[in-house]
């Protein structure tokens, strides 16, 4: 790319085994810096024992996974940008309840792998669900087939909805996921606007372009000689609220103007 930069990449679509293969392949190339986009890819690089400087972009719990010592002083050859904070779990529940007030039961779709920090999100969800009169049902998954079964199992449940927790697999399969959710006529909230772009009802999360731009700046600084241990991990400070109004109409949801006014973007 350009005259002095070569980029090699490998796509695993959230599959753990494929991610491990990608990690081994990229490490074998001995690059000057590695870039991990998701929890799964970062966990794979760590599992392979890489000592190559690494920047991550979407890791949920870098301290808990021992990628870094602290946000301010990573202390190792890894740094980057987190995209999620545990309190988002409760925010997703409250927004979904506001958009679809009839909801009484919420299925929480999540990947139980440690790197996804699902336990922290679930604790936040439970706390808000209890005060909102909503029953939250934890629905862990291991692959796309199990996610599909979970979604279908809720379609006959009265006043049910879905919360999708951060996960590389559901992001990679977002077209199939949102299509099935729509077929089952379930209100759902997602962690990235990518889902709303393909028919998802609502999302609340970071702006990916800003996260990637920040991560790219760290890659540039490392290539110019900076030590990852001295580059602080950056936590998100801004979140975007996206509503797909067309999907709301299909579901028969009447969205109040006050809610639409708060959205960063309304997709018609």
What are these regions (language model features)?
Residues 1-268:
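Short hydrophobic alpha-helices and adjacent helix-cap/hinge residues
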